[in-house]
């Protein structure tokens, strides 16, 4: 009967599923044997593919980054808007990538979590040097050119559900050439 090692040597490289099909045994048995061979230094693993090792020298410890195939699903940490907002308050303006690194999650998850805070006015997103940074309104924002003419001001108030803070935002419309300034309708 052909062994897992012999089959892998004949195939060059293969997945555990391919080896199980060739040997007509369960995938679990193949995986157990492959991990034993890996610990002994006879096979190597990259992603989901196994191959015979170049050198048959015993490795002292397998790499910690490599996990069995059943455990390779990524888990994304749960984060809340309050946690992200508190970090921005402490550390200043941050990009989604920087926040994702701090919280061990994806930048897409960070951006999605902060979208509601932006729409409610609890945070603003500012383009600085080609990167969008999330900021607390009124804190160390980049200098913006002032409008030449005086325009009316409107106040918008919103309360932060996380910290019990009332944030007042001053809205100044930029004047256009052919339009009169109107009050926004709520």
UniProtKB/Swiss-Prot annotation:
Signal peptide: none annotated. InterPro entries: DUF1627, WH-like_DNA-bd_sf, WH_DNA-bd_sf. Pfam families: DUF1627. SUPFAM superfamilies: Winged helix' DNA-binding domain. Encoded in the Rac prophage. This protein could be 17 residues longer at the N-terminus, which would make a 9 residue overlap with upstream protein YdaV and consequently the longer version has not been annotated. Missing about 100 C-terminal residues compared to orthologs. This is Protein YdaW. It comes from Escherichia coli (strain K12). The lineage of its organism: Bacteria, Pseudomonadati, Pseudomonadota, Gammaproteobacteria, Enterobacterales.
């Amino acid at each position: 009967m052909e062994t897992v090692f012999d089959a892998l040597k004949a195939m060059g490289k293969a997945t555990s599923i391919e080896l199980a099909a060739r040997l007509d045994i369960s995938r679990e048995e193949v995986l157990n044997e492959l991990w034993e061979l890996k610990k002994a230094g006879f096979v190597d693993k990259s992603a989901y593919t196994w191959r015979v090792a170049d050198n048959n020298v015993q490795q002292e410890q397998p790499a910690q980054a490599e996990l069995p195939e059943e455990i390779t699903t990524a888990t994304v940490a749960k984060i809340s808007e309050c946690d992200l907002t508190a970090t921005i308050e402490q550390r200043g303006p941050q990009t989604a990538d920087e926040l994702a690194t701090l919280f061990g999650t994806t930048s897409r998850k960070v951006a999605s979590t902060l979208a509601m805070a932006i729409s409610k006015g609890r945070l603003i997103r500012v383009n600085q040097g080609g990167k969008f940074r999330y900021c607390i309104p009124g804190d160390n924002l980049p200098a913006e050119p002032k409008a030449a003419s005086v325009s009316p001001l409107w106040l918008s108030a919103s309360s932060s559900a996380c910290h019990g803070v009332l944030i007042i935002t001053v809205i100044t419309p930029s004047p256009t050439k052919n339009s009169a300034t109107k009050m926004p309708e709520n």
